[in-house]
Each structure stands twice: as structure tokens, then as C-alpha cells.
Amino acid sequence: MRMYKMMGLGLAILLSLSVTGCGVKQVAMSGEGESYAVVDATGQKVKIPGKPKRILGNSASIDTMLLGVVTADHLVGATEADRDPAISYIAEDTKDIPMTIPLSGLSMELVTQARPDLVVASTYTKGEELTMYRNLGIPVVVIDGPRSIQQVKDDVRIIAAAVGEKERGENVIREMDRQLKEVDDTLGARTDKKPVVYLV
């Protein structure tokens, strides 16, 4: 039970980090430079021509992780969930992104309209959707649908590598670790206290 609570806390911390950006507001990505390769969560080696300027995440959780390492002006689409302040920590960050991705998902028309130079998807993404991106010649990086704190960290590292910001990804993970330890220490101190019973 505690593991699931800590995983939820880790995701919440990641959400808060995407808002503060860990200093990400100063990022300037050119989209130029040498190509590089990234190995995604499926073991696929993905060649990326240079730092992407037009990035498309296909879920709210992916957009949240992306905003931990890049600024919102690098995202070419935002999901309906991203924009809902009742459930999203990134509603304010994504309000000016022109394209809204409906809950029904991305169509070929929307993808061609967005013209992304990188798509970030997850292992929950349908195979035909991944095939659509690849048939359009777009590099696709797949992350795990996280089921643990470690997978959240692995996903952040893959995304950071894909956008050419590895060090920024490590900064996010270090801050996650710091906050998780702080909370774990606090919880541990509370559970270590033995109840005292007075008999009269």
C-alpha cells in the first residue's frame, strides 16, 4: 500500500516540478545540430535529426513530463485534460498551445496539421497509432506507462534524452528524490512512534 502511495506522490511531485520547471523557463532549443539516437522503453533505437522544436505528446501525463524539461512553446498540441484546471497542474502552461487533442485521441489530420518533429507516446498507445506516426516519417519515442517510482524516473530520462536535455532531466530526478526522501523521512518518524497507553 505504501509503495502505491509513494508512486502517487512521485507523480504529484513531477507535476509540481513541471509547473516550476526547475529553471526550464530559460531553455532555448534551436532544432538544429547533429542527429542523435535514443533507445526508448521498448528497446527501439530512435534516430532524432536534432533538438526538436515541435513536440507532440499523446497524453496528459506525457505532456506533464515534457514540461519538466522543455518550455510550453515546444509543444504543438495539448490534450483536453491538460487544459482542465480541475484535474491538471499544467492548465495554465498549456492555455496558449493552439491545438487541442480531443479525448478520442489523435487523427492523421490533426498530426499532419501539427507537423511535429517528435512524437512521445507510451506503451499504452495502440499499435496502429504508432504505425501512423512512423508512416508519416515522424520519430516516435515510446515510454512506459509508469507503474512505479523507478519507471517515472526512467520515463523522464528517456524524454529528456529525446529532446536533447539530459542534464535537465537529471535535475528533475534529483529534485524528485529530495522531496520523496523528505516525505518518507517524515512519514517514517511518525510511524516509529509507539502509542502510549496509561492504565488507571
Question: Where are these predicted regions, by residue range?
Answer:
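A short, structured surface patch at a secondary-structure boundary
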Residues: 57-114, 118-123
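Extracytoplasmic/periplasmic, Sec-exported soluble proteins
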Residues: 54, 58, 67, 103-106, ...
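Extracytoplasmic
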Residues: 33, 41-43, 50-53, 70, ...
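Extracytoplasmic/periplasmic mature domains of Sec-exported, cell-envelope-associated bacterial proteins
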Residues: 36-47, 52, 76, 118-121, ...
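Bacterial Sec-exported substrate-binding components of ABC uptake systems
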Residues: 2, 6, 21-64, 167-198
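Solvent-exposed coil/turn segments that connect beta secondary-structure elements
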Residues: 41-43, 60-61, 80-83, 124-125, ...
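Extracytoplasmic substrate-binding proteins
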Residues: 128-200
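Bacterial N-terminal signal peptides
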Residues: 10-18
